[in-house]
Amino acid sequence: IFDNGDSSMSLGYLQTDKSSLIEKNALALSFINKKLDTSFLIGHSNEKNGFLNNSFEGALSVEKNNPTNFIAFKKNKKTKMGELMFVSSLGTTDVKNNNNSLIRNIDDVFTSSFAINYSKPNILFNNSNLNFSILQPQRVESGSMTYDIPGLNDKDGSLNYTTYTSDLDPSGRQVDLSIKYSIANKTGIKYIIENKLTNDHGHVSRDNLDYQIAASMMFDF
């Protein structure tokens, strides 16, 4: 839309392939201030036959169009000690109900996510990078679903239903702590080792932490 050197504003559109489990299209307006190294993103996305990357079909189907409005913020800060980055997003989703579904209503769906990342180049060796990050994947902070559960038939053959309402916010909050070290050589090969500690994987409350260690190699050509 405009770019005056220090600041810019752009409008983007994204559409997933129709072969995807959930068809999604999104429209986003972004503003970037290069001096402050700060950016804002405001957008609107629409998912077909589902919401928040979850598919709802058959007896638990929802309508074709389920819009989400979201806002995101990103801030970078470069210092002599390295670079610090913070990213956060908030969203609200309006789920459209299907009259032929056992789901009656899905209301007040509010989501959040955030990430904090610190990186320091040239630790121990040239062309190396040490990275610390804390991440919370997208989580439903609030929302409720009202639905019918079929019971026994009456003598006349009519089916009885019992209506329930359940909160959609999960029992836990997934937070990932990651430490990653990478080094590249002159031939274009990059060696990476990453340690990750996860609390409440999948936003399901757990007594224990999950630990992962991974080593990989990348070659640029």
Model-derived features with residue positions:
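Outer membrane beta-barrel transmembrane domains
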Residues: I1, S7-G12, S19, N25-S30, ...
